[in-house]
């Protein structure tokens, strides 16, 4: 038995934030020293490395669960189902609901419970819980939903990924420019024709890797040292991803009934354009092949990195034909992959 998506939804915030927005920021390095480059140069270099030209921020009156609800409602409409038939709501995020101009995470009750309430689902046996798994959280939620259905514990699962990273960034850290807000969701149920998830793999590396992404104080020493913001060691993450993710993708393919030539698209977490390109290039090199043309759709240029939300948003955009030169047709085999805080990696193969 395989399980497939019957509905996919997204919510992309309306507020566009271009790189020009950051030109008045004062950036510091890790030692608390003002960067000697002007902000125009910093923005240019960021675009060259990450590909990001602009990103989206949630409205001031919105929080993560609001974004997740919008994506969930979109997925339910797309699936044309009664929300009361959903057995599980799995909400992937990392920071909870964070109100505008605060940096306090609110995770109780769970964001999944909040979405269930907003959807007005009355069925008490619709179980709602959250997943905190770094950027791969939505993919891990899909893998968990797949397991529930295979085990006979559920027939239909809603998996949401949403984040408001703009609320947890240090405005004096240039990495702030990478992060964005957004939400995506999908509904999974058993397939009658063996379409859907064909194989999957997850891994966690929690030795020194666990500290590659963390909460730390502002680079501006005048800021309150007790207030923490999202921080990362970008070079270490890049090296980790390049060494581990291609191997995980290969193992997933090799453990399936497919081979490398069957893969028609790779839908990868939109973390960093150069890193994603390097991962895919190394993946194909493991098979002594060059990267096929138009194999990897990207939307990071206009939407930035919204963590758990990037993959479901990207998938919905492809399915809606919103990306030039990227379509998914019936029978296509797509490889999904993500990497993030933990450090966690996951991947799955899906036949449409």
Where are the regions that the model predicts?
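Conserved beta-ketoacyl condensing-enzyme motif
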Residues: 5, 61-132, 258-277
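Conserved catalytic cysteine-centered active-site region
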Residues: 39-63, 98-156, 282-313
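Acidic, glycine-rich active-site loops and adjacent beta-strand->loop/helix elements
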Residues: 92-98, 132-137, 161-166, 203-204, ...
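A contiguous, well-structured pocket-lining segment that forms one wall/lid of small-molecule binding clefts
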Residues: 226-300
């Amino acid at each position: 038995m395989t399980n497939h998506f019957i509905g996919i939804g997204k919510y992309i915030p309306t507020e566009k934030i271009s790189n020009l927005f950051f030109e008045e920021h004062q950036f510091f390095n890790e030692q608390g020293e003002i960067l000697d480059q002007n902000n125009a140069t910093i923005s240019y270099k960021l675009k060259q490395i990450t590909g990001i030209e602009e990103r989206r921020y949630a409205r001031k009156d919105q929080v993560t669960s609001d974004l997740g609800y919008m994506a969930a409602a979109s997925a339910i409409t797309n699936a044309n189902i009664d929300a009361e038939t959903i057995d599980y709501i799995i909400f992937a995020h990392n920071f909870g609901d964070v109100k505008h101009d605060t940096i306090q995470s609110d995770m109780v009750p769970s964001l999944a419970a909040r979405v269930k309430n907003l959807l007005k689902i009355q069925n008490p046996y619709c179980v709602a819980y959250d997943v905190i798994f770094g950027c791969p959280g939505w993919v891990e939620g899909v893998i968990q939903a797949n397991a529930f259905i295979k085990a006979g514990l559920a027939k239909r699962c809603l998996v949401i990924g949403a984040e408001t990273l703009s609320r947890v960034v240090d405005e004096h850290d240039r990495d702030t420019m990478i992060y964005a807000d957004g939400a995506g969701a999908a509904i999974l149920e058993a397939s009658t024709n063996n379409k859907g998830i064909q194989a999957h793999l997850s891994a966690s590396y929690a030795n020194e890797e666990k500290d590659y992404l963390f909460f730390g104080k502002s680079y501006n020493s005048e800021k309150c040292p007790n207030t923490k913001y999202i921080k990362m060691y970008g070079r270490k993450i890049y090296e980790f991803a390049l060494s581990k993710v291609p191997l995980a993708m290969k193992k997933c393919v090799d453990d399936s009934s497919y081979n490398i030539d069957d893969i028609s698209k790779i839908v990868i977490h939109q973390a960093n354009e150069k890193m994603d390109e390097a991962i895919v290039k190394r993946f194909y090199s493991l098979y002594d092949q060059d990267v096929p043309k138009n194999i990897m759709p990207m939307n990071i240029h206009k939407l930035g990195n919204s963590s758990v939300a990037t993959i479901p948003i990207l998938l919905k955009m492809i399915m809606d034909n919103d990306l030039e030169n990227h379509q998914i047709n019936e029978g296509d085999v797509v490889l999904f992959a993500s990497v993030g805080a933990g450090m966690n990696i996951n991947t799955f193969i899906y036949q449409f």
